Amino acid sequence: MNQSSTKHTKVLILGSGPAGYTAAVYAARAMLKPILVHGIQPGGQMTITTDVENYPGYAEVIQGPWLMDQMKEQAKAVGTELIEDHIKSVDLSKNPFKAIGDSGKVYTADSLIISTGAQARWLNLKS
């Protein structure tokens, strides 16, 4: 793989839900120039959550997609680089850590934050 297909950062964040964007904001504010890699649908499960009633700072109910848009814009505003790619493998055996995307791009990082969230695994039971 040639040098142009490798991108290095101090902090690489995988996942664009609330945890990923929060990590990105704090890393950017610490001048670490983070890169956040997100999939096709950024925002995680919060993008399909209608009413969010337990987020600090909001006395009224807010909408999940709106909150994720706000978090994304804040992460960008403080200097986070957002990249759309799907990470298919990571190598944590040595530093710098390495993540390989479906795009063929190789991401290397001194620190790696994996915040890929959760996915429901439905039981095959009748209701």
Where are these predicted regions, by residue range?
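Beta1-alpha1 glycine-rich phosphate/pyrophosphate-binding loop at the start
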Residues: 3-78
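FAD-binding core/adjacent interface of flavoenzyme oxidoreductases
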Residues: 1-14, 30, 35, 82-127
